[in-house]
Curated annotation (Swiss-Prot):
Family in the record: Belongs to the cytochrome P450 family.
GO BP term (any one): biosynthetic process
Co-factor(s): heme
Record bears the keyword Ligase: no
Keyword Cytoplasm: no
UniProt keywords, alphabetically: Glycoprotein, Heme, Iron, Membrane, Metal-binding, Monooxygenase, Oxidoreductase, Transmembrane, Transmembrane helix, Virulence
Transmembrane segments: 38-58, 141-161
Protein's recorded name: Cytochrome P450 monooxygenase abl2
Compartment(s) of residence: Membrane
Xref: Pfam families: p450 (PF00067)
Major localisation: membrane
Cellular component terms (Gene Ontology): membrane
Induction (record text): Expression is induced during the early biotrophic stage of development. Expression is positively regulated by the ABA cluster-specific transcription regulator abl7.
Amino acid sequence: MFGDTSEVLPVAEGKGSSWPTQRLTMTVAFADGDRTWSFDLFSKLAGLALLSFAALFIQRRLFHPLRKYPGPWLNSLSEIPAAIALASGRQQAYYRRLHSRYATSSGTIVRVAPNELSFVDPNAWQDIYNRKPPHMEKHPVFIGAVAKVGGAVGISMAPLATKDHSRHRRALGYSFATSALVEQQEIILKQVRNLISHLKVFARKEKAIDMTDWYTYTTFDLMGDLVFGQPFGCLDGEGPTEWSRAIIHVFVSGAWEQAIRRVAGVNTWAESVLKKILIPKKVALWRRLHFAKSRETTLKRIKDGQRNHKDLMYFLLKNKEARQNLSDLEIMINMVLLVSAGSETTASTLTAWTYFVCTNRSVHRRLLKEIRGNFKTAEHIVWENTQPDQLPYLEATIHEALRLVPPPASSQQRVVPPGGAVICGERIPEGYAVAVPPVAVTHLDINFADPTGFHPERWLPRDDDDWDEKFAKDKLGASQPFSLGPRACLGKTLAYFELRLILASVLWNFDIDLAHAKETKDLWTMEDDMKYLKGYLTWVKPPLPVRLQEVKREA
């Protein structure tokens, strides 16, 4: 039993306060009788904690090197607000609100954490991600979805300051060269045609279909075939496989781990404990499944050698320098990264693009005219016929979809190198984290007119009939969906190739409309900080139900 007692102590006459002094005690029942424990120790600890907080407050608010940059006072004291924003999937909305709130006092810089600055000046892309050596490295706190395995890292974590990153990028670059992608075209077209054949079945049945699911099935099968030499089987199975279902959890788990490291530090006991407590077991299990399956399939594909299937591994194994530069474990880690990033991110763009086009009738009409006017048959929709100069309006709509829903949903932090760096004219001391938030930078009116509206015309030449003068001051360089510099997305060309082929094929074959327009618009609205879109490094997408009507053509 616990009970409280208080003892009034007398005050020496003529000295001190006239108020009685009390000492709080607690009586605890033990088997061998009552013992009285004093709270003196607890009060001292509380006082010490209060003193520590006061010292922290004074240091981080009054003497910290980043003190002049505005932001919420709690963010300047603790990593917790930024960690919660990331773990909840709402970092993109939170950072946009912060930049909007502090725009008048800071211009384009906000202190989002004690040791981190966020920039929405388009010039920050160059200053942070594409600067001359010494480059800004990733910090262990901000490791993404794929971390170190058995002492080895993939291209995403290989340090720029060593030869490791260039070694990885050079080895993988052969597989992503334009010449290699042209040779891989049949693999891509096979999955695109498979998608179209399934969509035709739904169109004939006049049934609504969730394009969020079907685009995801397509990109998973496509990346499985390109990376591992075999599709996941989502399209033919008309649903997700166990493996493909695991991939989104790689990003969710990665976001949670990053949030935990923000608060607990790197490789600490607190990090280990919080991971076990906070990360759902299901998420951790799915992540382990993805790594196990990837390892097994990669090693099998390496053993198969240069079989007559021109996937990414074919070109990596074919090039002796590339094969010698990477160990089997490094190849496996890179394949995990490629299939994860290449499937979910492209599916997000496809789905967002379809929503925007279905809700903008004038855009839809011009796209139909361009695509159906350029191709007499579906077989003509190939690499050489879908280049930007041939389908300029399709290209503009893709750029606009990537601006509104960029593939990386969260900031990609970098650490200022020794000696400090100048970012957007500001001298930033070494050791601090800096980043451009990809959503905030494109959703603010300081960079784009009507920033949450879908306006492909902003990407068109000024002599185009749809050009509007209100977009004359748009800072198009603020949109960098594939980042810049030595860590820019290796699969950028592949992503554009997939987007052009899939989207052109869908609009050439079908008339498409939203099935549940009001509900779907609520889910996909860009207003209210995209309140139904969650970003865990990449996007967790809401449903997109549509109705398809197959276009009938004379034989």
